[in-house]
Amino acid sequence: MKFKMFSVVVGTEACICSCPFCVSGVEPDQKNLKERNINWRNLKIAGNLANRSGIDTVMLTSRGEPTLFPEQITEYLKHLKEFRFPFVELQSNCIPIALNKEKYDKYLKEWYDEGLTTITISVVSNRPEINQKVYMPNSDAYIDLPDLIKYLHSFGFSLRLTCVCCKNMMDTVDKVEEFINFAKENKVEQVTLRPVNDEFRKKSAEVWIKENKLTDEQKLKIKYFLEDAGTKLLELERIGTIYDVKGQNVCLSLPLNKNTRDINPDNARNLIFFQDGHIRYEWEMEGGILL
């Protein structure tokens, strides 16, 4: 089999946020904050398979918030070095980092030295009041996003703002243009626009997603804007399209659903390693398992 992407699962379902569209995040407690043991033998198998597929990027991701497990991130980075992936990314909301820089200073230095190249920051907008409603509804305010960007850049990381596009948050051309301008002003290297997944994977999110997903018309307007205002750079099959919009790298991403599945074993989308040693090619379909 051959794959386009390699994802490595960090931590547990524990997350300090309670995003209504979330796949599986739950409130941290004594049990889910305990690190799980990693099957390093099977990570090597997954890494070798990723190398055979010609994958150039490994994404450290989570069912919850990975930065709640900083030591595990460090260990993963050390074990992944032997596979020599050019790009090593961490997907996070980065809120724990923004709220406790003193704690994460040493980890960020370690991660950079151990090969982490890119941190992707999950948001729903560039506007703090909108992000607060989704990510920090029980707090007085959202984190200072421009300050976080500047802070992470100071360690040498490349950054990507990944926006989950929802109704009344990121649903118009004007909002998208404002978001792109925000990224450019703050020297963010990459932007990803990802419409919230129509095929909800958590029953509790079903009603919210139905009410807050973008319409087909809204998606088309955003796509046409990017094509008119920008230059198409890359077409990544079943992943998305990358544009240059006034000097800003912007990816219009395709959500994981039946339309991004290919039954050709030489054209699988995602190779996924779980800490218990299971290696899968589907996030939600239990039958999509290799080991």
Regions found by a protein language model. Give the residues of each.
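Radical SAM enzyme core and accessory elements
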Residues: 1, 262-291
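Canonical Radical SAM [4Fe-4S] cluster-binding loop centered on the CxxxCxxC motif
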Residues: 1-42, 53
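Hydrophobic faces of well-ordered beta-strands that scaffold small-molecule active sites
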Residues: 5-8, 58-60, 88-90, 119-121, ...
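Short loop/turn motifs at secondary-structure junctions
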Residues: 18, 54, 84, 115-116, ...
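Canonical radical SAM enzyme core domain
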Residues: 29-45, 66-118, 123-130, 137-144, ...
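Radical SAM enzyme [4Fe-4S]-AdoMet core and its adjacent flexible, acidic
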Residues: 31-34, 129-134, 138-143, 150-262
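Short Fe-S-cluster ligation motifs
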Residues: 42-63
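Acidic (Asp/Glu)-rich catalytic clusters
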Residues: 48-52, 82, 108-115, 149-156, ...
